[in-house]
Structures are given as structure tokens and as C-alpha cells.
Amino acid sequence: MIIYKDIISGDEVLSDNFKIKEVDGVLYECDCRKYLKRKNEDIQLEGANPSAEEGDDDAGGDGEEVMVHDIEDQFRLVWLKTEEGMKPSKDAFKSHLKTYMKKVLAKLQEKGVPEAEIDAFKKGAPAAVKKILANYDNYDVLMGHSMDGDAMHVLIDFREDGVTPYATLWKHGLEEMKV
């Protein structure tokens, strides 16, 4: 299995369990699912036998259910919800992207990434930024669990069918970790 970590924060944000599609040489998109989850639900280890353990049946949460994206749930991403005043304004996000691009470029150079790959990032990023900013109002914005303000924001929108959510991430802002 391959886990993709944000090169700025080190947060795990994606894995090859998702069908990943490269877009314009600089972005990754992957389809997600939304489902109901009990709020504050404890994580159950696969193979664990909860009926053999002591405790009440409602130990996993307070009974209230919330909608979550699978990518959000699996990687403990934090949803910056508009109604809670946490989603950055378009101008603030644009400023973040400008700083983020510089940090990614510096990381790529620091890691000794081939010049051709760095050039591909420099060439493709401006068009991707323009595309993202044009669609910004439609995105749900999520951050890694560390809440590092300099790190990548994971963007979630819906496909043309209006039903299938998909996440958008910066290809060059991720590093692979085989587990």
C-alpha cells in the first residue's frame, strides 16, 4: 500500500486505496464517498470483537450522526466548514496558495527532484490555481490533522452527476510512503 503524505506537514492525506487520476500534470483527483458516521465514534480495530469487551452498546459516541467523506474519516482530515466560519475567504485562500506554491517548490529543490519535474510543476501550477480559484465557492476545504496553516488544503467538490464527491490534491505536494 502507498500512503501519500503532505511534504510540508507530514500529514497523511491520501492512499492508493483510492482510484487516483492525474489532472494537467500537477493535480490528483480521487472519487470519494459520503456516509453517515456516529459523532465522536471510537475507532474499532479490524478483527476486534466488541461484544467480548465490557461496556455499553453506545460506547462509540453520543448517538448523533454526521455526514463525513471517506477521505476525511480515514486520514483524520479537518473540515473547514463555512457555517463555522473556518473556511478561508477566496482572497485568503489565494494568498495561501501563493505561499504554498513557494514552499512546495523549495521542498522539491531541497529533495533534489529532477529539473524536468520542477519545470512541469512551474509550468502547470498557474493554470491549476486559476481553475481552482474559479471553482473555489463549490469546494469543501479540508486540512490535515496537524492543522498546519502552511500545508496543503484538500479540496472536495462533486462530479457533474451532482452525487459523486471527489478530492483534489497537489501532486507535487505529496510524497509517497510504502507500507
UniProtKB/Swiss-Prot annotation:
Please list the GO biological process terms of this entry. Answer: translation
Which pairs of positions does the record mark as disulfide bonds?
A: none
Q: Gene3D superfamilies recorded for this chain? A: Metal Binding Protein, Guanine Nucleotide Exchange Factor, Chain A
Report keywords, A-Z: Cytoplasm, Cytoskeleton, Microtubule, Protein biosynthesis
* Cellular component terms (Gene Ontology): cytoplasm; microtubule
Per its UniProt entry, which superkingdom is the organism in?
Answer: Eukaryota
Q: Name one GO molecular function term.
A: calcium ion binding
A Pfam family reported for this protein in Swiss-Prot or TrEMBL: TCTP
PANTHER family associated with the record:
TRANSLATIONALLY CONTROLLED TUMOR PROTEIN-RELATED (PTHR11991), TRANSLATIONALLY-CONTROLLED TUMOR PROTEIN (PTHR11991:SF0)
Family membership: Belongs to the TCTP family.
Q: Any idea what job this protein has?
A: Involved in protein synthesis. Involved in microtubule stabilization.
Q: What is this protein called?
A: Translationally-controlled tumor protein homolog
Species whose genome carries this gene: Aspergillus fumigatus (strain ATCC MYA-4609 / CBS 101355 / FGSC A1100 / Af293)
Q: What is the lineage of its organism?
A: Eukaryota, Fungi, Dikarya, Ascomycota, Pezizomycotina
